[in-house]
A protein has these predicted regions:
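C-terminal segment of classical bacterial N-terminal signal peptides
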Residues: 2-9
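Buried hydrophobic residues that stabilize the cores of well-folded domains
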Residues: 10-270
């Protein structure tokens, strides 16, 4: 179960850069509101036994501008995730380092708190070779602070423009990368403007298929996420979330396509 801490399917720019950033800030603000200084994550396997060799602890600074998460497991080794926030609660930098790779992202904002630029650098290495990548995302907004375009630059030379379309309310509905190999993502919402589906064209199946499906409770908390793999198998995992009375996530379970429990996390707050 320890290897499933991070969902590797997340790839859509709007979801990854903007929506997930807002969610991270929201979760940090809740920790600050509840005066929580430490979070311990306990990992369990599908048979409900503890995940051997797993350790995960999140430490929060006194002024809530620095959060360090240390994770160790037999499967993925050791890693440290450091997140820095400014006095307004906006994420400034995140750095994730492990025995095999280091990645860091820096965030720049305009006066209204919109993300203007994200600069990400990653470096991975093993006994045979090392690889490095620098990727910059530059966002442009309309007069209502809604993203309309993003310029992606890889290693200072490979660039592409990503266009965003909106509905009449202002929800992002389409993310379009022009070109033969460009992808077109569709975002769907419920009657409360909550994101319910992220869909793209699946070339293998020749049809529009979802990458993610989301469900919420009456408190607008995410209670279920289905992550679908690409390809012919149509395999997917379902994540279910349980929250405490004060809004903090306390349990996170993962099920297979056959509804078999693969493992789960329990969160302890101090």
């Amino acid at each position: 179960m320890a290897s499933m801490l991070q969902n590797g399917l997340l790839a859509q720019y709007y979801h990854k850069d903007i929506a997930s950033n807002k969610q991270a800030v929201k979760e940090k603000n809740l920790l600050q509101e509840l005066k929580i200084k430490k979070v311990i994550v306990h990992s369990f396997e599908g048979d409900r036994s503890e995940s051997g060799g797993f350790f995960c602890e999140k430490k929060i600074s006194k002024n809530y501008t620095l959060i360090e998460t240390y994770t160790k497991s037999y499967i993925s080794g050791r890693s440290i995730l450091t997140s820095s926030y400014n006095e307004n609660g906006l994420l400034l930098q995140s750095m994730d380092s492990s025995d095999m790779a280091v990645s860091a992202s820096q965030y720049e904002y305009d006066a209204k708190g919109n993300i203007l630029k994200i600069t990400s650098r990653s470096h991975s290495f093993d006994d045979d070779f090392a690889t490095s990548l620098t990727e910059v995302h530059q966002y442009r907004y309309d007069e209502k602070n809604r993203p309309v375009q993003m310029l992606r630059i890889r290693n200072g030379k490979d660039s592409a423009l990503i266009d965003f379309l909106q509905d009449e309310i202002g929800n992002i509905t389409d993310e379009i990368e022009p070109g033969i190999n460009g992808k077109h993502f569709y975002y769907y919402y419920d009657d409360k403007n909550r994101l319910t589906d992220i869909v793209k064209y699946n070339a293998v199946k020749g049809a529009l298929k979802p990458d993610f499906i989301f469900e919420y409770n009456r408190q607008n908390q995410l209670v279920k996420m289905v992550a679908i793999e690409e390809g012919m198998s149509g395999d997917y995992n379902t994540w279910q979330y349980v929250y405490g009375d004060e809004g903090q996530r306390i349990i996170e379970k993962c099920f297979s396509k056959e509804n078999i429990l693969l493992g789960y996390f329990e969160y302890e707050y101090k």
